[in-house]
Amino acid sequence: MSRYRGPRLRVTRRLGELPGLTRKASKKSNPPGQHGQARRKRSEYAIRLEEKQKLRFNYGVSERQLVRYVKKARAQEGSTGTNLLRLLENRLDNVCFRLGFGGTIPGSRQLVNHGHVTVNGKVLDIAGYQCKSGDVISIKEKKASKKLVEGNIEFPGLANVPPHIELDKPKLTGKINGKCDREWVALEINELLVVEYYSRKV
């Protein structure tokens, strides 16, 4: 399953607020569809599937990518759910979003893909790069690159930069100083349900 490129508000009507996907809020409260979906008791599978979809759409990853992250999270010490969230939070496109370089994760991914972002002084155009402690993420020293970011950083998609990331706003630079704490994950998600969803599939 590839990355979603359809209407974003349609997704948020179904799954709720996804700060990484869009800052806009739908004026319609009913689920998408001709008459909205009939309200009925959902199965445990449907609930787990919905939590998994929240993760996919918020971080903008494909199903195949998410499966890889789940496998990697399982192989690490500690809680699989927390490990999974940290892997997604450490993606370069998400770090740029949390720094305010892009208004959304898709917008931040575009900055990375188009070569406007450097990591440790070198241009890096891999949105899924896993940022690690000590990495310095900057906007390229070009007028066009800086112009793309300056408007976003004044009105970031999320109000607060997490404490594990140090932002130097005038220099358009951020530094990773550790791991993201669970409480600073901006998405309302039950990651344990996502782990349960994949327990028999992966």
From Swiss-Prot:
Any one of the GO BP annotations: translation
GO molecular function: rRNA binding; structural constituent of ribosome
Role, per record: One of the primary rRNA binding proteins, it binds directly to 16S rRNA where it nucleates assembly of the body of the 30S subunit.
Protein name stated in the entry: Small ribosomal subunit protein uS4
Family: Belongs to the universal ribosomal protein uS4 family.
PROSITE patterns: RIBOSOMAL_S4, S4
Pfam families: Ribosomal_S4, S4
Location of region: Disordered: 1-42
